[in-house]
Amino acid sequence: MNIIEIENVSKTFERVKIEEGLINSFKSLFKREKVKVTALSDVSFKVKEGKIIGLIGANGAGKSTLMKAMVGLIKPTSGTILVNGFNPHDKKNDFLKSIGVVLGQKNQLWWDLSPYETFLLHKEIYELSDTEFKKNVDELAKNLGVLEILKSPVRNLSLGERMKCELIASILHSPKILFLDEPTIGLDFLAQKNIRNFLKNYCKERNTTVVITSHYFPDIYELCEELIILKNGEVVFNNNFKKIKEEIKSYKYIYLSFENEIDSQDLKKYGEVKESDTFSVTIKVQEKLVNETISSILKEFNVIDYNLTEMSSQDLIEDIYSMESTGVKITV
């Protein structure tokens, strides 16, 4: 069952164009030239219930715009969006009760109140019974390790504690779909890991659908089953993330140090040159060709030293952003 259906969605914004100079600034007070900016262009995809989907792209790719359209904060210029069978922009109560939203740079918690007082407000908004409210708060706070700080003012909490409480506020009503926009932004490594582990277990137990955007790639790499990549407002990749991981595992980096000056162009026949300087080159080759490649290079060049390394998460995301098609093959 598809719980999210996006079909041919586009979104354009109008911006005022202001020319440089005092005279042009004065003219703009009376006549403003407007330009259209395309944030989303003919975006289509479907999400099955219970899946964790990663939505990634460079800054300005359209991730936040698409996320806001899916939760009903903005209306698309054209196309249709169905989330749990609802048009998000209608903001029907049943729809709002079926989603949870965490925006990493926008707080739900009141600065001078305790998280628990915000939870009480959400209890009334989502019409939770006393029993359900207590059960959910106790369970979520225990799993996230924040039981002891629920009644402390938000201003006295660390960033990690606040973000965990933000997460509780968003899922207190047991939503079917959870939208996470940069949920671990600014957090330390341990806090990020704790939130990821919690989300894995929570979503598995409750079959919750999750759409997550993040520039911190371990969030995507460790949580997501499928990946959607946006580039300039368009979907350039929509596929199972496991296939990408398997593809990446089939590559190795070979770092080579040479006795004499080397022209990196001479190494291109052996693999993709990733880095180079006067006396060293790093190339990317398929794992099955590593031994053959090293043997051939040693015969042709005076190599002082070489070593092999795995592709890192950062390497992976750079390769993914450089994909030119919707296939699994990586082409950087």
Regions found by a protein language model. Give the residues of each.
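Conserved ABC ATPase "signature" region
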Residues: 23-28, 120, 124, 131-149
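Conserved ABC transporter NBD signature motif
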Residues: 79-89, 95-96
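Catalytic Walker B motif of ABC-type/P-loop ATPase nucleotide-binding domains
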Residues: 178-182
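ABC transporter nucleotide-binding domain
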Residues: 196-284
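C-terminal coupling/interaction segments
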Residues: 286-332
